[in-house]
Amino acid sequence: MYNNNQNHHNNDNNMNKDEPTTIYPEFISISNEIKTNGSTNSYLNNIRREMLSMVNSGNNNNNNNNNNNNNNNNNNNNNNNNNDSIVINMDTINNNNNSNNIDINKSGYSQISNTTSNDNLNKTLLGNNEISQINDIDDDSSPEFIKYKKFISSLSYITFIGAAIVLINQKKSVYIQFHAYQSFYISMGVIGFQFLLIWSDILSIILWSLYLLFTIFMFLKVSFGGYGNSTIYKLPIIGNLSEQKAKLRSQEYSRYFKYHEDLFIKELREHKQALIHQSNLNRNNNNSNNVNNNGHQRINSNSSSVVMSGDVESMLNSSGSNSSIYSDVQNDIGTNEE
């Protein structure tokens, strides 16, 4: 498990070398925040990679448009750029820990909305998410996250108030929820016995003394002890009930979480499609504008040539008339001399 998480961190480091910084700065800030606060969460990593791929695709579209504009300004139109493609790198966490590359053709907006391609994309993004696979009380986590989980679990033994706060804020980890449920049930049991033993001060003191020793023991063991099934310290009856409740609650939360993950990634994909579609429209508009400009230039050149030819003809006609006038004057002079 440590090697797998190390591979994910290496993939993040490799991705950071090519992260764009010139477009969608809000996505970059969100991506950096996700990297800082949730690098061990598979869902957050998927969202971060999806946003980075969308930003990369937007930069590629802008570069292609700039290249097309430069070529059009130099009257070197090249229509072969219509078949360019965007490569979306989606490194999702699956059983084989592989990366999948999906080519999306930019030449048609309708091609992206194909049902088969959408199904494959959904399977790639959401098919093998580790939060929906909870088989043991010691759920999978990275080594650097174990200390945090142990600390939160130990806080749940600070009376039923600490357990309730942990249950409200921690819904994914089975390990944390197990200790919170176990502490909550023990606290409620002690409070219930206190009402039954309220008539005896000695029994009440013994009861609360045992509860205090139990909470101190569990706090120290969970905080500084080992991590795993062998160091869970599960009580015979309450422990089994706590384990079942923790697994059931985590599974319900994972389904709810996965549903919102589907919606969020769907919105990202739709926004990416809109970017590609807008890029195609801009490129087509640029091409049509360049064609119109070239047509106007040809018309202007033809009109100027016509004007020039008309000027030449008028000049020739005027010179001819002048020569005829000159000949008439010469004839008049000759007749006068005779």
Swiss-Prot record:
The lineage of its organism: Eukaryota, Amoebozoa, Evosea, Eumycetozoa, Dictyostelia. The chain crosses the membrane at residues 148-168, 178-198, 202-222. GO terms for cellular component: membrane. This is Putative uncharacterized protein DDB_G0292342. It is a multi-pass membrane protein. The keyword Ribosomal protein does not apply. Glycans are attached at residues 37, 83, 97, 105, 114, 122, 229, 240, 286, 302, 317, 322. Residues 1-20, 55-92, 279-303, 316-338 are annotated as: Disordered. It is found in: Membrane. Residues 9-20 have a biased composition (Basic and acidic residues). Its main location: membrane. Residues 328-338 have a biased composition (Polar residues). Residues 59-92, 280-294, 316-327 have a biased composition (Low complexity). The keyword Transmembrane helix applies. It comes from the Eukaryota. Keywords: Glycoprotein, Membrane, Transmembrane, Transmembrane helix. PANTHER family: UPF0132 DOMAIN PROTEIN (AFU_ORTHOLOGUE AFUA_3G10255) (PTHR36460:SF1).
